[in-house]
Structure formats: C-alpha cells, structure tokens
C-alpha cells in the first residue's frame, strides 16, 4: 500500500486555514477586504464574544451572482485575477481565492447576497461542506455570518487570548482599513455596543477623529510629494503628539495596509531630532505606485509586500515629512499639559481655532451623541512589550484605561460646538492634493518662525525667561545650548579636516578577539569622522591623535563611546555615525542644570538659537522652549472671564 496519498479537500482546507485564519481578527480582515473589493460604501461588522461566537460582516457592494455563490467557497476560486500577468499587476486586496474556503473549513458560515438583478441567494457551509443553498430576498450587497469559529479544530481555541485582546485585534485591523479607505463608512459593534464608527465622507482627518479622537486629529499635518515612480501623501502628527510604539503609523500602498520596517524608519527619519528618545509619531501614509512595482504575493496574510526601488521611496517619504515639518511652528504651548477639561472648554476652543490658519483647519465633523476618544488601534500583540495599548471601546467594555477622555459628553454641548465650528470653518476652501503645488524639497529657514526674544532672567540656574510681543517664553538652557552645539558639530564633523591634535601619551584600547575583528571591519566608519585606530598587537589598538573638536580631558571616553557604537550597531552609514557623534559631543559640551549664567552669556545664547536650522528641539527631541501666549496669561490670571460669567476682559 503506498505511503504517500492525496489529502481530502476538507483536510486541505483546514490546513490552508491554519495559515490564513489565525484568529477572529483574520476572519474580519478577509471579509472586510472582500467588501472593499466589492465596491462597498458602507461596511458593518457585528461581533459576539470577541468573534469566537459570532462574526457578521454586511456591505452594500455589488454582490455575488447566483451561479457564482457555491463556486466562491472553492479553494483558489476568484474573480480578481485570471492569468499570470494579472498576478503581477494586482489592483484588488484579495486575489488568491482562499478566504471563504478557509473560513468555511473551520466555522459555520451562512452567506446571503444579491446583485442589481434583485435575485438573492443564501448558502450555508459548515466545516467545508455545503449544507444548503436557496434563493432569498435580500438587498444589493452581501452579508456573511460566521458562527462557532474553530468548532472542529478545538486545539486552536487553546491559543486564543482574552476576549479583550481578541476584540482589540479586530478593532485594530478595521481601524486601519478605515484609515486606508476614508471614503467608506465603517461600524464595529461588540455585543450591542458601538466600538468604531467612521463617516465615510472621504476626509482622512475626519476618519482619524473617529478613531484616535478629535485632539489627535487636530494635531496632524498633511503632506505630499511625488517623483517619477511614487506619489506619497497623508497625515502625520506634530512632534509633541507621539506614542511609545511605532505601531501608530499606518502604511497604505495602493489602498492596502502593509507593514514595512524600512518605510517606517523613513517616516521617523523625516522627524530628525524633533522626536524624544523612545517616542514615535502617529499618522497615515498613503503611497501610490504602479502595481508592477509591488509584489503582494509574498505573505499568507498579504500584510508584507516587496517593493521595487524601496530606497528611492524611503528618501522621498523622509524628505516630504522633513520639509512639511520645517514649515510648522514647533514651540509647545505651555498650557497643553493642563487638564483637558479645563483646557478645552467650549469658548477656549473657539479662541484656539481663531489662531489656526485656514490652510491647516481640520475638517472634522464631531458627531452628536458619540464620544470621540483618543484611542489606540495598535496591534496588542506587537506592542505588549512596549506599552499597553487598549483598543477603542464603549463605556461598557473593560479593555483598559483610555489614553484620553472625551472632550465632550453632553449632546447639547456637542451641537453647540458643531455650530460654532461650522461658522469658523465656513471660509475654508478645500483644495485637492492634485491641485496644490508639490513641496520644494529644500532647506526651509526656521529663523523666520522663531520669535524675537528679549532676555529677562534666569530661574534656578536652569531656565531662562524671555519675552516677545506675543507673550512669555521659558527656555531650558541645557537643551538650548545642546541644539546650538549640535548644529556646530554636525557641520564640523561633516567637513572632516586634516586638523588633528597629537597626544603626548597615546591611548591604548584593548578588546576581545571578536570585537577586534569587528573594529577592523568598520574602521572606515571611524575614519570618516577623523578617528584613526592603528593595530597595536593582536586585539589592541593605539590612538596617537584625534580631531581638534574633541573636548579636552574627555578624549579617551569619547573614543571608547564611538567605538562602542560601531560594536553595538554594526555597519552604520557614515551619515548615521556622524549624527550620533554630533549628538554626543553637543551633550557633553552643553551647560548643565544649576549652572548660573550672567546676562551676557544668556543673551549670547538667545542670539545663537535663531541661527539654528531647528531651534525648537534639542538633538534628543526635548523642547528647547515653551510659550505662554498673552491670551494664556490673561486666562491664568482671570483677566478673561468665561462668557457665561461676564464675557469681558478686566482692565
């Protein structure tokens, strides 16, 4: 009897389902992507018991013809590709024809659908076997009901996380698909509670407001750029709105949400030194390219893709974000850290909006009766080690503390805010991305946005007080001089000269055999900044001179730290190594806290700061200065009374 035999269709489908259907969120992803491919404009997801009991996805798409309904549940049956050429020119989210077959192999599935013809069809498939098929009255579109997921593979259930975790993963993937498709209205309900709702009006900022909250949506800036092969656009957060995880960045390639480490690094690189250490921006990055430049058939869930000309795309993305942020005034408002309930009262919001230019006015439509929350949509499994990130939820769901509280809770106040917002935004003229001129990827002077400061005093030997016509400024003297030093050293290191300081006593460095091999392999990186290590035995090196910009008395520590970078990070680019060196030197030579400056030194520092390319942050991303506007000061001293009290400013 032969030992090799062909598996049954049922068993084959169960094996295939192991790759495609990992958890309830996988079912939701596949069904929602099918709805998007069906040109739906409204997609509703209903969940029971975090999807383990029931998942129902309804859409108003084009539906499935009666003759195709049964075929749709066969493996590798699809309407989206036909030839090999189609496989390398995919424009749809799905194309393998595995989703329905894989879901039906491990669940009880009932699908009801109808096209414009008006003839509806219902099919019932359980464990891969068709139980029944009949005509049924149904509107145009498709409803897929999935019950008892993994009923015939109980071992899979043992690896499910808690209901909160599984629900968080469902909300995460639907939220990302909603951000990738702002022209589609999405809802997610869990056990009768609305968890996610987007308007589907094609406004990405409005979609973000429904997912992350109004305050986050308002802190986003739009950007765009293109070259011969790529077009990038989207919304990304200002440097003060960050998270402890990279997963708040959503990358969308030709309408498909993907994960790509190099492109994520490119986005972060666009911020330069504006981000705090360990903090990452939020945003949605849309990338459009010829379908021939992207291979989506490399991962079972299609979450990872291969991109042609990835380095070119990364450079375009970094420069687009860098240029856009260079146009922003990045001085934090000193009152931003006050309690939200005090900060965002209705009348204060109107005052804040009066300061926003029409070009940056967000087109968010707060929805009456809906609590817009600043929620997390990150994949919980990916970020559990970094920071707990609860998913968006209704008050009845105990998924964890929300990152922010709703700005408004009362429907009447929402209505009042909506009226005022519409009045304030009435003069805003929306401009299509295609109609705006492309950004000039070139240096933008920050000095034009830096205030003309007059020095007042020093506080605790740590902070400098200064004023300008628009209010009071408080500067961190260490961060300020660190920024000034950084830009000096970045230029000095970038223009490596032959000027070397010879040591009276050479420095000898001893390393392990493995480290010595690595140092020799990366010696060119060290030499790119003027540091020369000569062999001095099998595992030792000698340094006889060093660049003149090394700080006296710290030569050996500086050299050891630079070598440690190479040993830790491996093959760094020359640019990255020079950047790290400039940051280290600027920090070592900056004045520290509790160091008292005389008036001349303080004024000299304030004069140098506007000359910096980025005077707003130290190289580690901390703010250099904060701003109390005249209005802020008047509010703090109650010189501006609330409108319900007097509406007048005191003399």
From Swiss-Prot:
Keyword Transmembrane: no
GO molecular function: ATP binding; ATP hydrolysis activity; ATP-dependent DNA damage sensor activity; mismatched DNA binding
Gene Ontology BP terms: mismatch repair
SUPFAM superfamilies: ATPase domain of HSP90 chaperone/DNA topoisomerase II/histidine kinase (SSF55874), DNA mismatch repair protein MutL (SSF118116), Ribosomal protein S5 domain 2-like (SSF54211)
Keyword Kinase belongs to the record: no
SMART domains with a match to the protein in the record: DNA_mis_repair (SM01340), MutL_C (SM00853)
A Pfam family the protein falls into: MutL_C
Assigned keywords, A-Z: DNA damage, DNA repair
GO cellular component, one term: mismatch repair complex
Disordered: region residues: 383-405
Disulfide bonds: none
NCBIfam families recorded: mutl, PRK00095.1-3
Family listed: Belongs to the DNA mismatch repair MutL/HexB family.
Free-text function comment from the UniProt entry: This protein is involved in the repair of mismatches in DNA. It is required for dam-dependent methyl-directed DNA mismatch repair. May act as a 'molecular matchmaker', a protein that promotes the formation of a stable complex between two or more DNA-binding proteins in an ATP-dependent manner without itself being part of a final effector complex.
Protein name as catalogued: DNA mismatch repair protein MutL
């Amino acid at each position: 009897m032969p030992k090799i035999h062909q598996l049954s269709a049922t068993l084959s489908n169960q094996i295939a389902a192991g790759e495609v259907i990992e958890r309830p969120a996988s079912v939701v992803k596949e069904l929602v992507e099918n709805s998007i491919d069906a040109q739906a404009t409204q997609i509703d997801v209903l969940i029971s018991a975090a999807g383990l009991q029931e998942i129902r996805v309804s859409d108003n798409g084009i539906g499935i013809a009666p003759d195709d309904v049964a075929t749709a549940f066969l493996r590798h049956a699809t309407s989206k590709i036909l030839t090999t050429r189609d496989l390398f020119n995919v424009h749809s989210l799905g194309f393998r024809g595995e989703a329905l077959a894989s879901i039906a192999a491990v669940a009880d599935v009932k699908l009801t659908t109808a096209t414009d013809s008006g003839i509806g069809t219902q099919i019932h498939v359980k464990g891969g076997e068709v139980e029944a098929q009949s005509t049924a009255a149904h509107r145009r579109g498709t409803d897929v009901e999935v019950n008892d997921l993994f009923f015939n593979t109980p071992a899979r259930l043992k690896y499910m996380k808690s209901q909160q975790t599984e629900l968080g993963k469902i909300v995460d993937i639907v939220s990302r698909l909603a951000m990738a498709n702002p022209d589609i209205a999405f809802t997610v309900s869990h056990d009768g509670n609305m968890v996610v709702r987007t308007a589907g009006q094609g406004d990405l900022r409005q979609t973000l407001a429904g997912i992350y909250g109004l305050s986050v949506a308002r802190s986003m800036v739009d950007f765009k750029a293109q070259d011969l092969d790529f077009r990038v656009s989207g919304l990304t957060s200002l440097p003060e709105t960050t998270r402890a995880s990279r997963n708040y960045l959503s990358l969308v390639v030709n309408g498909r949400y993907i994960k790509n480490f190099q492109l994520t690094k490119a986005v972060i690189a666009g911020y330069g030194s504006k981000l705090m250490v360990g903090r990452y921006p939020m945003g949605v990055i849309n990338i459009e390219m010829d379908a021939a430049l992207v291979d989506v058939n490399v991962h079972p869930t299609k979450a990872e893709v291969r991109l042609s000309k990835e380095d070119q795309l990364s450079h375009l993305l970094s420069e687009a974000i860098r240029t856009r942020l260079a146009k922003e005034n990045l001085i934090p408002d000193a009152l931003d850290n006050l309690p939200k309930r005090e900060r965002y009262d209705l009348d204060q919001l109107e005052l804040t909006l009066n300061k926003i230019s029409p070009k940056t006015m967000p087109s968010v439509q707060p929805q009456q009766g809906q609590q817009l929350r600043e929620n997390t949509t990150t994949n919980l499994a990916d970020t559990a080690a970094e920071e707990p990130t609860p998913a968006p939820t209704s008050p009845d769901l105990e998924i964890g503390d929300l990152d922010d509280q709703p700005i408004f809770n009362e429907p009447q106040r929402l209505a009042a805010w909506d009226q005022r917002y519409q009045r304030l935004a009435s003069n805003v003229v929306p401009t299509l991305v295609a109609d705006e001129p492309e950004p000039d990827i070139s240096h933008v002077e920050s000095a034009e946005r830096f205030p003309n400061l007059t020095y007042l005093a020093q506080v605790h030997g740590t902070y400098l007080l200064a004023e300008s016509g628009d209010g009071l400024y408080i500067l961190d003297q260490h961060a300020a001089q660190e920024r000034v030093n950084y830009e000096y050293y970045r230029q000095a290191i970038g223009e490596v000269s032959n000027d070397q300081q010879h040591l009276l006593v050479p420095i000898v460095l001893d390393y392990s055999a493995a480290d010595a091999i690595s140092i020799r392999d990366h010696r060119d990186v060290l030499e790119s900044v003027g540091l020369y290590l000569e062999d001095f035995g099998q595992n030792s090196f000698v340094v006889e001179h060093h660049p003149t910009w090394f700080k006296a008395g710290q030569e050996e520590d500086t050299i050891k730290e630079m070598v440690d970078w190479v040993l830790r990070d491996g093959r760094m680019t020359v640019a990255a190594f020079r950047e790290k060196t400039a940051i280290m030197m600027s920090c070592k030579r900056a004045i520290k806290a509790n160091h008292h400056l005389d008036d001349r030194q303080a004024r000299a520092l304030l004069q140098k700061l506007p000359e910096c390319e980025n005077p707003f942050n130290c190289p580690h991303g901390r703010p250099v200065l904060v701003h109390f506007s005249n209005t802020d000061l008047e509010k703090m001293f109650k010189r501006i009374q609330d409108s319900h009290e007097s509406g007048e400013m005191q003399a």
